[in-house]
């Protein structure tokens, strides 16, 4: 998109200020949605409560499709949080981008590989943690030598591949969408004909990007449940 992200140094590490800002914004939005949707609960839900119950039922279906509820019920909150957080993050960069002094401040946080790979690493680490916690270290390690011991190196490579593909898939789709939107926005500033030519494609692509953002949030959450089920279920 041709703009740099402002950075800050802390303890010898470099952090992107725009990433910190947008991660915070996404977190606050998800928190507010959760609070507003559960503020006044009723036996006969309506409006916002219907929405949050639909999200819960949807994620519960993802859990049940990968493992039995007794094993996977504890991951419901994780799944709901990931689904809502990633969807909100994917949407933040769609309406506009804020650039100040050639520094890009407002964007989708998931359009940065540092964010998506961090989420992926968190998911994979959690899957290993729960695998050891729920099955024991011995049963957990034996899976790396099944069905044949010589496949152990491939199992290790698979773990790294899962982490990379989980994070980079999300990043690539969201970043590509923002690149195209920025190109269309640039075309719109070239004059009257450019504005006319870019307006309809931009609206269509923004609508399609909402669909893509929702699908990517679903895929990330689904794969999270798949990876967790592989580690915590004895039949995988």
Swiss-Prot record:
Molecular functions (GO terms): proton-transporting ATP synthase activity, rotational mechanism
Keyword Translocase recorded: no
Transmembrane segments: 18-38, 80-100, 112-132, 179-199, 200-220
InterPro entries: ATP_syn_F0_a_bact/chloroplast, ATP_synth_F0_asu, ATP_synth_F0_asu_AS, F0_ATP_A_sf
Cellular compartments annotated: Cell membrane
Cleavable signal peptide: none
Alphabetical keyword list: ATP synthesis, Cell membrane, CF(0), Hydrogen ion transport, Ion transport, Membrane, Transmembrane, Transmembrane helix, Transport
Primary site of residence: membrane
Membrane topology listed for this record: Multi-pass membrane protein
CDD domains attached to this UniProt entry: ATP-synt_Fo_a_6
Pfam families to which the protein is assigned, alphabetical: ATP-synt_A
Origin superkingdom: Bacteria
CC annotations in GO: plasma membrane; proton-transporting ATP synthase complex
GO biological process terms, semicolon-separated: proton motive force-driven plasma membrane ATP synthesis
Membership in a protein family: Belongs to the ATPase A chain family.
Record text on subunit structure and interactions: F-type ATPases have 2 components, CF(1) - the catalytic core - and CF(0) - the membrane proton channel. CF(1) has five subunits: alpha(3), beta(3), gamma(1), delta(1), epsilon(1). CF(0) has three main subunits: a(1), b(2) and c(9-12). The alpha and beta chains form an alternating ring which encloses part of the gamma chain. CF(1) is attached to CF(0) by a central stalk formed by the gamma and epsilon chains, while a peripheral stalk is formed by the delta and b chains.
Task of the protein: Key component of the proton channel; it plays a direct role in the translocation of protons across the membrane.
Protein name: ATP synthase subunit a
Species lineage: Bacteria, Bacillati, Bacillota, Bacilli, Bacillales
Gene name for this UniProt entry: atpB
């Amino acid at each position: 998109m041709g703009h740099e992200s402002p950075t800050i140094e802390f303890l010898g590490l470099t952090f992107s200020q725009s990433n910190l800002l947008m991660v915070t914004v996404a977190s606050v939005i998800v928190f507010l949605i959760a609070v507003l949707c559960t503020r006044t609960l009723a036996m006969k839900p309506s409006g916002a409560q219907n929405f949050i119950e639909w999200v819960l039922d949807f994620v519960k279906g993802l859990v049940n499709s990968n493992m039995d509820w007794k094993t996977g019920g504890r991951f419901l909150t994780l799944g709901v949080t990931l689904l809502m957080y990633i969807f909100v993050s994917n949407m933040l960069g769609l309406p506009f981008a804020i650039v100040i002094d050639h520094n890009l401040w407002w964007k989708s946080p998931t359009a940065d590989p540092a964010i998506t790979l961090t989420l992926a690493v968190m998911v994979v680490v959690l899957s290993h943690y729960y695998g050891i916690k729920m099955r024991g270290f011995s049963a957990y390690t034996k899976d790396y030598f099944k069905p044949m011991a010589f496949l152990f190196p491939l199992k290790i490579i698979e773990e790294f591949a899962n982490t990379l593909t989980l994070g980079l898939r999300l990043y690539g789709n969201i970043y590509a969408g923002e690149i195209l939107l920025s190109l269309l926005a640039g075309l719109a500033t070239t004059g009257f004909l450019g504005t006319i030519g870019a307006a309809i494609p931009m609206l269509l692509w923004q609508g399609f990007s909402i669909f893509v953002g929702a699908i990517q949030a679903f895929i990330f959450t689904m794969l999270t449940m798949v990876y967790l089920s592989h580690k915590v279920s004895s039949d995988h």
